A protein has these predicted regions:
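Coiled-coil dimerization/phosphotransfer module
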Residues: 1-170
């Protein structure tokens, strides 16, 4: 009964949990409500966000723009940034993704945010119950937009957020 091995194994496990919890807490505090850094466009802000959010992980991220980028009001940019943050956090935390692709698509009357990953995927009807997805839906509704989810278990996810820009021109 003097074998220290089971105790050491439990201590190792407890330490690993504590380290993982601390990393998650740091990520959460850092990205509670992202703001647009002064002098940075939306793509630059997304780059900063992904660098911080995915630091210390092996996840590959690809950011790109389709269409001609244009100025959007700060509140719309910050909302898109917050939504991108939530979707990437979901891919990391729940989806166990190895890569995430984020595309900003500027169209004449709207802007689209596409977030795609190779994670575990999910049942879109069940995802509505989560706080993060519910919060995204509420924000999109207030802005007159929509969210389209293409995901199934085991096959990754592709989520498209479409927001009108006509109400939000600077």
């Amino acid at each position: 009964s003097g074998d220290p091995e089971p105790v050491l194994t439990r201590l190792d496990h407890a330490r690993d949990l504590a380290v993982a919890s601390l990393q998650e807490a740091r990520r959460s505090v850092m990205v509670l409500r992202p703001r647009m850094p002064e002098g940075t466009d939306l793509l630059g802000a997304l780059r900063l966000l992904t660098d911080r959010l995915l630091a210390g992980t092996d996840i590959q991220v690809e950011l790109s723009v389709l269409g001609k980028a244009r100025a959007l009001r700060t509140n719309l940019q910050e909302e898109l940034l917050r939504i991108a943050q939530e979707l990437m956090t979901n891919a990391l935390r729940h989806g166990k993704a190895r890569w995430v692709r984020v595309v900003l698509e500027y169209e004449p009357r709207q802007v689209c945010l596409h977030v795609e990953d190779d994670g575990r995927g999910f049942d879109p009807t069940a995802a509505v119950a989560g706080y993060g997805m519910r919060s995204i839906r509420e924000s999109i509704c207030k802005l007159g937009g929509r969210m389209d989810i293409d995901s199934s278990e085991g096959l990754g996810s592709r989520i498209t957020i479409t927001l009108p820009t006509r109400r939000w021109r600077p």
